[in-house]
Amino acid sequence: MERQCSTKSQSWCVRTAEDEENNFMMICRKGNVYELMELAPFISVDGHLLHKYDHRGRQCIHMVALYDRKNAIMKIEILVNMGADINARERNTGNSLLHIAVKTKNYELAEWLCREPTVNLGAINYEHHTAYHMAYYLHDEKMKELLITNRAVCDNPEGIKMSEDDISDFSSDN
């Protein structure tokens, strides 16, 4: 499906729906905050890209949390204002943004998410693990304390079995 650019100044404008998706995901992953802000009026009108999953089962909001530690909070705020779901789950793992923050050891993002009133602090992924369970099995004392302090769901994971594969999945970029 061809798209036409309305002005020459819209250098991000692309020719096909696939190119559009790839460019948007790339800006979410590696672009700067200003590039994302420039897209806001266009994406907000037709928000399908905000909810589209890539081949790894991730939406744009997951890409930001995984790959742009420095600007994650600002970009996530912009995406949510455009209509992205702050509680969206990765399709393949069921991980939430809070799970991703634990996995990437992004303490600033984790604390910010815990303070956002609409974030589900008790989200459970497809392996039945909360973000706290991940921090527990990764032996990340700083993250565990952050989650406890900010009232995330921190039930005792002792009775929950976790294999070595599950633990390695936390630290790999599947």
From Swiss-Prot:
SUPFAM superfamilies for this protein: Ankyrin repeat (SSF48403)
Alphabetized UniProt keyword annotations: ANK repeat, Host-virus interaction, Inhibition of host NF-kappa-B by virus, Repeat
GO molecular function annotation: NF-kappaB binding
Repeat (ANK) residue spans along the chain: 56-88, 93-123
This protein's record includes keyword Repeat: yes
A GO biological-process term: symbiont-mediated suppression of host NF-kappaB cascade
Origin superkingdom: Viruses
Purpose: Suppresses the host immune response through NF-kappa-B inactivation. Possesses ankyrin repeat domains required for NF-kappa-B binding but lacks the regulatory regions required for dissociation from NF-kappa-B and degradation. Therefore, prevents host NF-kappa-B release and subsequent activation.
Similarity comment: Belongs to the polydnaviridae I-Kappa-B-like protein family.
Protein name as catalogued: I-Kappa-B like protein C1
Species in which this protein is naturally found: Microplitis demolitor bracovirus (isolate Webb)
